[in-house]
């Protein structure tokens, strides 16, 4: 039997699937199928299902139903939307952004402009590029935009693009499935976009993204879809991107060191952050 909430998550009619093998409508990943085949319990497995060709991303628990010591006659399965799990995790972990636009102190015309642009960005839906020297408060503005936006209840995931070695960059950003490469964690790893699902992904020092990966990230941002390394399922990712840089990206584009398409995807809204030395009335 298929309970109402599970049917809603999977997009299936409970009456239509009664008496039929569930695999006729639902395709599951290999490790989940292996657990079912061998009658093993599953605890908090992140699952990528295909339900009549539609991807469903959820957390699944399976409890075998046995009579005596025999092979299980079935399973009790509980499913939860992965976005719900992420929201609970970030609430418990204290990962909600706490900065507000009122934390942008100062009375200068420049800081008032930044505050107005940040308010407009918070109301909008486009990706945001924050430009300015190191130390001008780009991280504060990014958090404040997130917290003033309709995504405030979602996670705020901050990533320093300079922190990852080149050979690990894609696996860190796109995530990977179990066994995707030598040394990969057995349980796999979600992409940064999945971690930010329903919220904001803040890409600090975006100029440090290796050029050969620009087209991949640009495509994820454009389509709102990601496929983990070694994976076969496309995962929808509803994420807003805020990027920051202390570099003239237009100059990098002209030099061939930054892809124009990625810059276009990142900069629906551009906010220039002035250094304190240019706004003496705020000192």
Where is each model-derived feature located?
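Glycine-biased flexible loop/turn sites that connect beta-strands or occur in inter-domain linkers
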Residues: 53, 69-70, 217
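Sensory coupling linkers of modular signal transduction proteins
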Residues: 64-106
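AAA+ ATPase active-site-proximal loops
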Residues: 96-236, 240-252, 275-276
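Sensor-regulatory modules in signal-transduction proteins
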Residues: 49, 65-67, 276
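N-terminal capping loop/helix in small sensory signaling domains highlighted by a polar->aromatic N-x2-3-F motif
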Residues: 1-7, 11
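Conserved Sensor-2/SRH helix of P-loop NTPases
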Residues: 283
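Terminal output helix/cap of sensory domains in signal transduction proteins
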Residues: 10, 14-59
